[in-house]
């Protein structure tokens, strides 16, 4: 559909070329100016595309180099992939722009009535390209001189690298001597290790003896604990017996008191009985005479009672005596028991003191046993650490040997790279010879292009003659159009009745236009919101990419720091080894001192305070010996630190020499790559010039064919110009507006293309500076971050441009509405001024044709706005 519209537009422009309106000259000049500007914009676009292709090629080459340089990190690869995706996206955008521009170019080519300006512009472009080729030639000559100077510098750098290699060989010999010293120290360490292992075995035997003694002490402790338990049990039994004896003593004391009371009662009874006996005797003496007869009868009873009482008294006296004796014996037993109780109390106190002393000794023995066990564990741990440190020292020695081997390999690699640089210098010389040969070919091609330029000038002269003929035909068509204008003015008076229907149709078409414009506005707003969301998502993605790039930059900074730390680790390796050795010797002294302390403490358990004093003196003497050993070790550490500083200085000199050699190698590689890129660029430009020449030749032939077709169509258009003059003028005006809008779009697209070309050129310059500083990856990533920020700004600028375009379309809509209102006003004025007359069928047909032309113009305007 779009192609059909463009073809109709082209046909309209070709038919109007011989119109009869007085404003056609102005419109035609405007059309020619627009076409000239479009041609200039197209040529600028072609140059921008060519330059963008070159920049894309260079960006691809530099991206490959960046891939090779940053292959160690996956994050930089992802970043480069994103950059490639963005470049591909930009290429797609350029291709889409190119496609749209090509479509516009085809439509403009069909509309163009002459090709003279294009041929003149092609000639000017060829001249400009010739001047550009000459400038490139001079630039290449200057670059060849620079390359020769760089080759001289490379030879000088080679000589300096050879001298540095000799210095590195001397340093390598010195490092070999240092490795021999380290090997000798390793043998000494192995001897010390064997001595330590023998001492470790002795310590293990001593430890076993200590463990046996600890077992004996534990057995003695258990026996002492059992004795203490027996003594505790016996003490408890004695306490119980004492309590029982005290209870018996109290019970006996109570019995004694009872017996004493009974004895007192019995003695009182005996005294009472004696008093009664005396009374009885007195009664008997008094009553002897009275009771003489009874006395004689009762004497036997009395004697019997007396005998009973005497027996009772004797029994009581015997019991009292027994009780007195028992009391005396109890008193003696009491005194004896009190003495025994006092003795038992003193014995219990002594036993408690002995028990507390034994408990204290048992606790001391337990603490001593735990200390001995802890020290034995510490000794075993220290022995294990010494063995692990010894293994670490051996591994570090092997690592030093591997580092020495790596240095030798790097030396060999530098020699191979030196030979490769010599080969590259030879290849550069051959490429210079090829470039000179290509320059001669370019000069021959220039002569051919000058001959073709002469041919094009002759063709231009022929085209100017054809243009003169076409001007004559145009004047004739102008006269015909004037005649047609007079006829149309006569018919215009006859179309008063048609104005009402025309007004209705215009109002209807205006309503349709308003509906379509509202739909277009809604569609455009939705499209604008979608584009805005898409650009916002792109901005968010770019911000995410910026964050990832920042993270990648931080990771690369960390890796750079890690690489620098690696060199520092190599420098501090000897210091660590010496520190480990010092720690091992200190640990050995500590273990020996602890062993002696253990032996002294075991002897302290067996011996007295005098042995402890002797052991203290012995420990002081050993401390003095340890201090002397520490002083000797400090002297050794000082010597080792001096050796370390000397080795650090040698390593720094070697590192600087290696950095200089690597920098010289990279500089030569960069120069070779730049020369290869320049040679490829010249070859591409040569091919492009050949393609441009072929394209110009084909375009010239095509334009000749189109000129013939245009002349035929112009002759056909002369017949139809009398009928369609006014309609064609209106369409021409609409087409001029469309061309102006297209010219604005083309100018914007050209500006965008130029901005993209400038951006590509800026990216090329940035990438070129990155290629020169390829070794510093952090700066390259910073440049990539800057580019992403610029791209974010470009997207924001594009979003703002889209908003500006929407504003422009709204302004155009308002302008079109104003034009419609002005047309209605003019129609009203014409309706009021033109006399009301009946119109014929011819006039009605003209009005219907005019109405159809107006509706078609509005439809075309609506499609162009969409």
UniProtKB/Swiss-Prot annotation:
Pfam families membership: Myosin_tail_1
Superkingdom of origin: Eukaryota
Where located?
Cytoplasm, Myofibril
Signal peptide residues are none
Key words of the record: Coiled coil, Cytoplasm, Disulfide bond, Motor protein, Muscle protein, Myosin, Thick filament
Q: Region (Nonhelical region): which ranges? A: 1-22, 840-866
- Record's GO cellular component terms: myofibril; myosin complex; myosin filament
Main subcellular location: cytoplasm
Coiled-coil region(s): 23-839
SUPFAM superfamilies, per database record: Myosin rod fragments
What does the subunit section of this Swiss-Prot or TrEMBL entry state?
Homodimer.
Q: What family does the database annotate?
A: Belongs to the paramyosin family.
State the protein's purpose. Answer: Paramyosin is a major structural component of many thick filaments isolated from invertebrate muscles.
Q: Kindly provide the name given to this protein in its UniProt entry.
A: Paramyosin
Q: Which organism is it from?
A: Schistosoma mansoni
């Amino acid at each position: 559909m779009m192609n059909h519209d463009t073809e109709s537009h082209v046909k309209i422009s070709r038919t109007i070329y011989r119109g009869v309106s007085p404003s056609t000259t102005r419109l035609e000049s405007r059309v020619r100016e627009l076409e000239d500007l479009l041609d200039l914009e197209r040529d600028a676009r072609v140059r921008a595309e060519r330059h963008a292709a070159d920049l894309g090629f260079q960006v691809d080459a530099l991206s490959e180099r960046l891939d090779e340089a940053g292959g160690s990190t996956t994050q930089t690869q992802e970043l480069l992939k994103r950059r490639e995706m963005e470049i591909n996206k930009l290429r797609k955008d350029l291709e889409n722009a190119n496609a749209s521009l090509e479509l516009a170019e085809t439509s403009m080519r069909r509309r163009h009535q002459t090709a003279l300006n294009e041929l003149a512009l092609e000639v000017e472009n060829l001249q400009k390209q010739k001047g550009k080729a000459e400038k490139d030639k001079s630039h290449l000559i200057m670059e060849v001189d620079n390359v020769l100077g760089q080759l001289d510098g490379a030879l000088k750098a080679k000589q300096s690298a050879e001298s540095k290699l000799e210095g590195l060989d001397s340093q390598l010999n010195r490092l070999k001597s240092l490795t021999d010293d380290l090997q000798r120290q390793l043998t000494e360490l192995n001897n010390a290790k064997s001595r330590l292992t023998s001492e470790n075995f002795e310590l293990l035997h001593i430890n076993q003896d200590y463990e046996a003694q600890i077992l004996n002490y534990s057995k003695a402790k258990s026996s002492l604990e059992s004795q203490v338990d027996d003594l505790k049990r016996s003490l408890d039994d004695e306490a119980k017996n004492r309590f029982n004896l005290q209870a018996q003593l109290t019970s006996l004391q109570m019995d004694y008191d009872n017996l004493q009371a009974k004895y007192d009662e019995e003695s009182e009874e005996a005294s009472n009985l004696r008093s009664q006996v005396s009374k009885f005797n007195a009664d008997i003496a008094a009553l002897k005479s009275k009771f003489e007869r009874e006395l004689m009868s009762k004497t036997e009873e009395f004697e019997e009672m007396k005998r009973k009482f005497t027996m009772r008294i004797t029994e009581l006296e015997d019991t009292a005596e027994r009780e007195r004796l028992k009391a005396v014996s109890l008193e003696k037993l009491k005194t004896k028991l009190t003495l025994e109780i006092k003795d038992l109390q003193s014995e219990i106190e002594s036993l408690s003191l002995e028990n507390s002393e034994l408990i204290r000794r048992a606790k001391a023995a337990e603490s001593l046993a735990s200390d001995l066990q802890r020290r034995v564990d510490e000794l075993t741990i220290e022995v294990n650490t010494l063995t692990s440190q010894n293994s670490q020292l051996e591994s570090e020695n092997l690592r030093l040997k591997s580092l020495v081997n790596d240095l030798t390999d790097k030396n060999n690699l530098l020699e191979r790279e030196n030979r490769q640089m010599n080969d590259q210098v030879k290849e550069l010389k051959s490429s210079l010879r090829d470039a000179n040969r290509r320059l001669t070919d370019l000069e021959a091609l220039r002569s051919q292009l000058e001959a073709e330029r002469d041919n094009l000038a002759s063709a231009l002269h022929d085209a100017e003659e054809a243009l003169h003929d076409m001007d004559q035909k145009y004047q004739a068509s102008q006269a015909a159009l004037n005649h047609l204008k007079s006829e149309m003015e006569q018919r215009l008076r006859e179309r008063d009745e048609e104005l009402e229907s025309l007004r209705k149709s215009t109002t209807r078409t205006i309503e349709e236009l308003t509906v379509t414009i509202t739909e277009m506005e809604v569609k455009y707003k939705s499209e604008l919101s979608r584009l805005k969301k898409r650009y916002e998502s792109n901005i968010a993605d770019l911000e995410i990419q910026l964050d990832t790039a920042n993270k990648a930059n931080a990771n690369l900074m960390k890796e750079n720091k890690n690489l620098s730390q690696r060199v520092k680790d190599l420098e501090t390796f000897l210091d660590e080894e010496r520190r480990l050795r010092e720690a091992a010797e200190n640990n050995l002294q500590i273990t020996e001192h602890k062993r002696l302390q253990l032996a002294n403490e075991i002897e302290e358990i067996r011996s007295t305070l005098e042995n402890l004093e002797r052991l203290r003196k012995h420990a002081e003497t050993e401390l003095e010996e340890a201090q002397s050993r520490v002083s000797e070790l400090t002297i050794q550490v000082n010597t080792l630190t001096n050796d370390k500083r000397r080795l650090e200085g040698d390593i720094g000199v070697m590192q600087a020499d290696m950095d200089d050699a690597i920098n010289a190698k990279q500089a030569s590689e960069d120069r070779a790559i730049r020369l290869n890129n320049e040679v490829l660029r010249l070859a591409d430009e040569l091919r492009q010039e050949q393609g441009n020449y072929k394209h110009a030749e084909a375009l010239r032939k095509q334009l000749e064919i189109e000129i013939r077709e245009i002349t035929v169509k112009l002759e056909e258009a002369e017949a139809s110009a009398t009928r369609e003059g006014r309609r064609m003028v209106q369409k021409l005006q609409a087409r001029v507006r469309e061309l102006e809008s297209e010219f604005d779009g083309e100018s914007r697209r050209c500006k965008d293309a130029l901005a993209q070309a400038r951006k590509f050129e800026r990216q090329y310059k940035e990438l070129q500076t990155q290629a020169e500083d390829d070794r510093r990856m952090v700066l390259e990533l910073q440049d990539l971050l800057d580019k992403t920020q610029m791209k974010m700004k470009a997207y924001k600028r594009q979003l703002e441009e889209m908003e500006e375009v929407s504003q422009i379309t709204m302004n155009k809509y308002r302008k079109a509405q104003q034009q419609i209102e002005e047309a209605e006003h003019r129609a009203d004025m014409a309706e009021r001024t033109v006399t009301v007359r009946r119109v014929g069928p011819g006039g009605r047909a003209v009005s219907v044709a005019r109405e159809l032309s107006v509706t078609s113009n509005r439809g075309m305007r609506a499609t162009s706005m969409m």
